[in-house]
Amino acid sequence: MQSFRKIWNKPRPDDWMPLARFYYADSALNDIASELDSFDGRRDPDRCNALVTRLRVAQDRVLHIITEMLIHLYPREQDRACRDFRVKFPDEILHDTLPGQLWFGAECLSAGSNIIDHETESDLIRPLAKDVTKQLDFLRDLLKNQSLRDPSAYNPVIKENLLKFDKLFAEFEYQYVSAMVPVKSVKEHDSQLDVAVLFSEVLSLALVKDLITQDLIDYCDPSVMIAIPRLGIVWGLLVYSNGALNVDVPAENLSEMFRPFYSLLVKIRNLLRILTPTELTKLETVLCKGESAVPEDTSSTLTMSDFRTNATDEEKAKNNQRVWMCDMPSDSTSSLDSSVQDSSSETTSLASSALASPHSGSEENVSQIENEEGDDEAIGTNSNSSNEVTESPETIEEPDNVDMEESSESEVDTHIDETRNESDDEITDDVQASDVLQVETKKCKSSRLLEQKKFDKSVKTIIPMQTDPRSQIDPKNLRSRFRSSEDLVHRLFVCIAGVADQLQTNYSSEIRKVLKLILQPSEIIPVYEVVNAQVANSQTEGEETGVEAQETLPLPAFMGVRWVPDEDCEQCTACSMPFNFVRRRHHCRNCGRIFCHKCSCNTISIPEHGYDRKVRVCNLCYVHRLNSFGCNEPMSQVNENGATVPSVTEQQSAQTASASS
């Protein structure tokens, strides 16, 4: 009986209904599976790999058609299985071939295979995989039998099994993907949404301040993608301080993207608070432009290039470097020394790589930004214990040490001369910097410790024991660390741009997802509100409530064109040649009218009507669809009564012809 149905009731290959397309997709899948089982894959691995690829493509096509049936039968998302968990998945997981990969994985797990390096997870989800494959095989048999009976109807058994399979497949998708890749937790997802809200507010504020134009957003200019994270750091620390960049809370409460830069963000926030409105505007401008136009004065700064090229001014530069380092706190000096020697520290690696700037003195920029609060942190540390200064061996005043340090000046000069005379290919910049800075640090430490011992005694009576050092920052003291206003703006630009660039590099998928949320928002479906809180009575009034109006909105679906019945047309619509045994009727898939073979010999794909592959269309529709400067509507359509109604283009042409006559 099944064979006779296949012969007489087999759907047409060009039928756009989902059940008809499922029949041919399922038949192709069975053919590939039979061919794959008919030979030994170890003898011909290339052919086996090619067949496996074709099998996964065929499985993916079958699942897409089943999904289309579910959408057609249950248009509302709440009637189908919930898949909101997909927002926790990485972007590289969500693609069109995911259903086919899940089916293939379920087949492998059902056969006894394990996920590589995930044997425990494989044993846990194996029963669910068997249920999915069993339900899918049963559903395929039901759909294939129904496609041979009536491709346009769905009985209650099919509807029930479609929903059952949808729920099983959604549950298997979550467990399988969770076993394969790390999935975000609820807290991490909420933190990512907070960052999206911050960037959205930043984009709106940037439009108000004319830092970003609407044209740049419409054209998706790369400068917008670069400027939004940079401005987000500035305004997230100043304007929206209680949002995603609230550094007053522990680092664990921040987003995963900003957590590695917690200490650096605190220091950037403190520097941003001492900026004047003019300086803040200048900083925002240079962050949007992508480059700092602030000239840097290096007359009092010793850089690495001075050791290599400035032989005549070596002594002067060396003395300036000593004076500058003696003025710095001991914590800052030690941190600067360790930042040159040990590049594995978090903020130092950021300074040496992402915060690198073509401007001279960039090494000093990062070191001073990293240690801008050296005095305050040292104060807070020393105030926690009254005996710390006296007990520490480094803080004991030793005149012999001072004399010894003073007597070593000649050794320092000799060491610098030897370092300068060595070739660049034998001694690197890092070695030169570490040698010089170690000696200079020893010379300045004794004088610094003498001042610190006297200063700690007075600080203990001013700052309480449990006071946070960050709350005692003096704006004047911070500003005095920089040579000028331009120097402060430039150093902030280097650090903020470096953090933003690190976000773009290390968290590219998260940044891309956040930018997609704010630059390509989801379409908002309008909901009609009830006026004056009056609920309509469906029996007496024709007015609908807001929920009813929302449910009756038109839903996107593939709708076919109504065809002209064969008995209503005895001749070709284009050439008016009568149909006979030789000249057969052909329907145009675009307009639904009947033509002969000569007038409908063209084929083209019509995705909006459900035809993904090429189908037959008449010559007129073919020309109109290929003409990019013309309209794509059919020349005429068929109304509900079966009568041919001319299109707008034909009506305008007829009116023009009648007016000219």
UniProtKB/Swiss-Prot annotation:
Location of the region described as Disordered in the Swiss-Prot/TrEMBL record: 294-432, 641-661
Binding-site list for Zn(2+) 1: C572, C575, C596, C599
Residue intervals of every FYVE-type zinc finger in the record: 566-626
Effect of loss of the gene: Causes ectopic vulval induction.
GO biological process: negative regulation of epidermal growth factor receptor signaling pathway
InterPro entries, per database record: FYVE_LST2, LST-2, Znf_FYVE, Znf_FYVE-rel, Znf_FYVE_PHD, Znf_RING/FYVE/PHD
Composition-biased stretches (Acidic residues): 394-411
Annotated keywords: Metal-binding, Zinc, Zinc-finger
Tissue spec: Expressed in vulval precursor cells (VPCs).
SUPFAM superfamilies, alphabetized: FYVE/PHD zinc finger
Family: Belongs to the lst-2 family.
Protein name: Lateral signaling target protein 2
Source species of the chain: Caenorhabditis elegans
